[in-house]
Regions:
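...with weaker cross-activation on analogous glycine-rich loops/strands in unrelated enzymes
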Residues: 66-148
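Short, surface-exposed, charged/polar-biased interaction segments
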Residues: 50-51, 74-75, 79, 159
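A short macromolecule-binding patch
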Residues: 148-155
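N-terminal capping segments
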Residues: 1-73, 86, 181-199
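Low-complexity, Gly/Ser/Thr/Pro-rich intrinsically disordered linker/tail segments
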Residues: 157-199
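Functionally constrained cores in energy, signaling, and assembly domains
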Residues: 58-61, 128, 148, 177-178
């Protein structure tokens, strides 16, 4: 399922929405996984990847992000989670973002292995907070482990400010031979936010 990648580029985004305890709990759960080498909730262990982290975070609130989906609904794990949000929550592009929101990305790696950046819904993270300049801080898993990442949709093409503050982390690895149109920063690869808990 394809969603726009440019809907908020350069617009006034993002601000944190009014805090709701259940959403705060999701954000705190995501932060609690930082640096962990396993994603576990009770007796359940999740795969050590971005989808597994999202599943584990939401499991802390009794939410199964694969609930109601057939085995192939949505394709990969990220696509399945996106489909769940479409069915049970709200896909949006800001300008307000909730703690615990899911944040989806396109083209973070060559999923279909054809050498082109044409891979929808390849990564997901969980929003922890929004900084005063609108930079979204989210928790996700990449090859280095479970870490915090930043994304600024007002400056999607800028990695750092002049004083060294990170606005957009690198989310796609650079490879020799990448097509000229390949993008690498979080703000460039942003697909959408997803809200499941609204009260």
């Amino acid at each position: 399922m394809m969603v726009p990648t440019t809907g908020t580029r350069g617009e006034i985004c993002c601000a944190i929405a009014d805090r709701i305890p259940a959403q705060e709990s999701l954000a705190q759960a995501a932060a609690g996984f930082l640096g962990q080498s396993r994603i576990e909730m009770g007796y359940r262990r999740f795969t050590l990847d971005c989808s597994g982290l999202a599943l584990g975070v939401y499991a802390t609130q009794g939410i199964d992000l694969y609930s109601g989906l057939g085995k192939l609904d949505g394709g990969n794990g990220v696509g399945r989670i996106f489909t769940h949000v479409v069915q049970h929550g709200r896909i949006h592009y800001g300008p307000t973002v909730h703690p615990g929101d899911l944040v989806f990305f396109h083209n973070t790696w060559d999923f279909n292995r054809d050498g082109f950046p044409n891979d929808p819904l390849t990564h997901v993270g969980v929003v922890e907070k929004v900084e005063v300049d609108g930079t979204v801080v989210f928790v996700s898993w990449v090859s280095a482990g479970i870490e915090r990442y930043r994304m600024n949709l007002q400056e999607p093409d800028q990695h750092k400010t002049g004083d060294g503050r990170v606005l957009n982390d690198f989310m796609r690895r650079k490879w020799p031979g990448d097509p000229q149109a390949t993008r690498y920063l979080t703000g460039q690869l942003f697909a959408a936010f997803g809200t499941l808990i609204s009260r």
